[in-house]
Amino acid sequence: MVQFMKMTEAAYAAYLPEAIKEYAEEKVKAGTWAEVEALDRSATEYGQLLPDGIQTKQHYLFSIVDDPEQPPVGMIWFQLSESTHGRTAFIFDFKIEEGHQGKGYGRQAMEVLEQVARRMNIKKIKLHVFAHNTRAIHLYETTGFVTTDLHMTKTLN
């Protein structure tokens, strides 16, 4: 079973530029942002969400490890918020590295996340997934997530 290890500053320094780039690419692929603006917008969003990096309050960034002596197989980042409905975790990023996909690490990570959430008295876990990411959608649906909102777009020529 995989484990979550608090992300180190070095891991965060390696993660951030790649995450900014990947998020920009996903927003362009989804048709939400124009390519010319995507990288700047992505960097701005990350700067607003994580102004203090891994030290940002209520944000939890973990490396996902199978063997603590080996490089991580992935990462997960969620934010904790509180409301009248109880504590909620919102997953901002979750990734299993390409060479480790299809080995059950994603499913294991979702199980570990549930354990962590229960220990933190979290009542709900939420996330956003791009509609074109069918592999992720399948993982989330088969681990108990349900669609709560759905945005649709029609491009006019």
Predicted regions and their residues:
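Generic anion/oxyanion-binding catalytic loop in active/binding sites
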Residues: 1-4, 129
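Acetyl-CoA-dependent GNAT
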Residues: 3-98, 116, 147-156
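Conserved acetyl-CoA-binding loop-helix of GNAT-fold acetyltransferases
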Residues: 93-96, 102-115, 119, 138-142
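Conserved beta-strand-loop-alpha-helix junction that forms the acyl-donor binding cleft
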Residues: 123, 127-136, 153-157
